[in-house]
Regions:
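A short, highly charged nucleic-acid-interacting micro-segment common to nuclease
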Residues: 6-16
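An alpha-helical support segment within catalytic cores of ATP-dependent transferases
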Residues: 14-33, 98-102, 109, 125, ...
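Active-site acidic catalytic loop and adjacent metal/ATP-binding pocket
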Residues: 44-51, 57, 194-243
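Short, surface-exposed alpha-helical segments at coil->helix boundaries
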Residues: 18-22, 73, 254, 258
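Short beta-strand segments
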Residues: 58-60, 94-95, 154, 208-211, ...
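Short glycine/proline-enriched coil/turn segments at helix->beta-strand junctions
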Residues: 33, 51-55, 250-253, 266
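ATP-binding pocket architecture of kinase catalytic cores
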Residues: 9-11, 34-165, 179
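Helix-rich C-terminal or lid/interface subdomains of diverse kinases
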Residues: 42, 129-133, 235-241, 246-317
Length: 317
């Protein structure tokens, strides 16, 4: 999630019937004698299905989404080999075009399913002694990939925190939303947000970044409690490495986030932690506002604020 809510962004300009999903699955993966197709959910851009818990199919919700899938195909051609040594998998996305007889208008994304459950959402007993160094190593190698390897992909360059794009301008709306709860525990959040100023552009070396490393995009092994994969790279950009740390405190807290920073082993400028704190605080409040525009279930977003701000917001649950 890299920008604020609008109904149009969640809309779909085509129909998708389950019969079409079956036809496309049979075309995309021939010789499927027996199979089970499961609907996994829908996001900004795609309706997502799995086949036998072995393959992922992503169906664009709008024509404009095709360019996002094409971007992921290009990015994955660099990421898959570069990150193989980390033991953290990334989707090896390919595009396939359904035959005209199926009646689905767009190409779809397909890739081998990465095992694991979404971090911070499904309750998992974490193995921090494995998760922390493995995640730090993943981020270190990711941010060490030479940016010229992405030069032909026309990625955006961001000298400010891209995760806050669209939210900075909505500061007054976010403040009004926080006031609406009339919960004293949120006063510290309101006071900080009311007085904070936008960060100056980052002047250091830019890296390739995931740029939306929210908990749902990190997969963890439910049995062993460690990271298995990172998905949804459509917001990938050349930017400030801090961007990929901002959402870690949402679900692992500050102590474990700082332990990842300590194990990261790439040079950090003297404002790294300041930008990390600013981004985490602002984005946690923005996520609450954003989700409230379309859902009454704000339990995850409230939990994020509790972890980032170290508050008890049980009155909101």
């Amino acid at each position: 999630m890299s920008s604020s809510y609008s109904p149009e962004r969640w809309s779909s300009d085509r129909d998708l019937r389950f019969g079409q999903v079956i036809q496309i699955a049979e075309e995309a993966i021939p010789n499927l004698k027996q199979y089970e197709i499961s609907y996994l959910g829908s996001g900004w851009c795609n309706d997502v299905y799995s086949i036998n818990n072995n393959w992922i199919l992503r169906f664009p919700r709008r024509e404009e989404v095709i360019t996002h899938l094409q971007k992921e195909v290009s990015i994955s051609s660099v990421l898959v080999p570069a990150l193989e040594e980390t033991g953290v998998l990334v989707p090896d996305v390919k595009l396939t075009t359904p035959s005209p007889s199926v009646g689905f208008p767009y190409p779809i994304g397909i890739y081998p399913m990465i095992k694991g459950v979404s971090a911070g959402i499904d309750p998992v007993e974490m193995n921090w002694t494995d998760f922390i160094p493995k995640t730090a190593n993943f981020l270190r190698i990711l941010h060490s990939i030479p940016v010229d390897q992405f030069k032909d992909f026309h990625l955006p360059t961001q000298e400010t925190l891209g995760c806050l794009e669209g939210f900075i301008e909505m500061k007054e709306d976010i403040l009004s939303h926080l006031h609406s709860y009339e919960v004293k525990s949120l006063d510290v959040c309101v006071e900080w947000l009311d007085s904070c100023e936008p960060l100056p552009p980052f002047s250091g070396d830019l890296s390739f970044i995931h740029n939306d490393l929210a908990p749902e995009h990190i997969l963890v092994d439910p049995e062993f409690g460690t990271i298995t994969g990172v998905i949804d790279w459509e917001d990938g950009a050349i930017g400030d490495p801090v961007s990929d740390f901002v959402t870690l405190p949402f679900w692992i807290g500050w102590e474990n986030t700082f332990r990842i920073c300590d194990s990261y082993s790439l040079p950090m400028d003297d404002k790294f932690l300041c930008r990390l704190e600013y981004g985490s605080k602002f984005l946690s409040l923005a996520y609450l506002y954003d989700e409230a525009q379309r859902s009454n279930d704000l339990s995850s977003q409230i939990s994020f604020i509790e972890n980032v701000w170290e508050l008890d917001l049980s009155l909101l649950k």
